[in-house]
């Protein structure tokens, strides 16, 4: 079994255990490996433009807001924007701050006919620690994975 297959199978098993409606749930390190090794894999960052500008993001990702800043109002054009930028047959990985919005995006994309959707658990910044700070408990940045500041 190849590395990509093993990672995707683990993510699919996780999704079954978590009773998720989309294909799989990846850890940040697994998502990074998929992006490096799986031809055609696409990372969709669903954080707000403000988050991308102020906090940073993953180079080469497609940015489509799930909700807009300020106010975190749902983006009524999310699926239309996704369809303009991402083929429905692509292996699509969704990322947000901590995994919540990306879960919603992966669910919506699956319902809209995307067949290979994965949520990146822990998100870009991870969960808050005891001092209410992010970037120390899980997440893309805390894992030391590549990212860029705008």
Where are these regions (language model features)?
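Rhodanese-like catalytic fold shared by cysteine-dependent sulfurtransferases
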Residues: 1-41, 49-91, 102-150
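Short, surface-exposed ligand- or partner-binding patches at beta-edge/loop junctions that are enriched
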Residues: 94-95
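Conserved G/P- and acidic residue-centered "switch" motifs that form tight phosphate/ATP-binding loops
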Residues: 45, 99
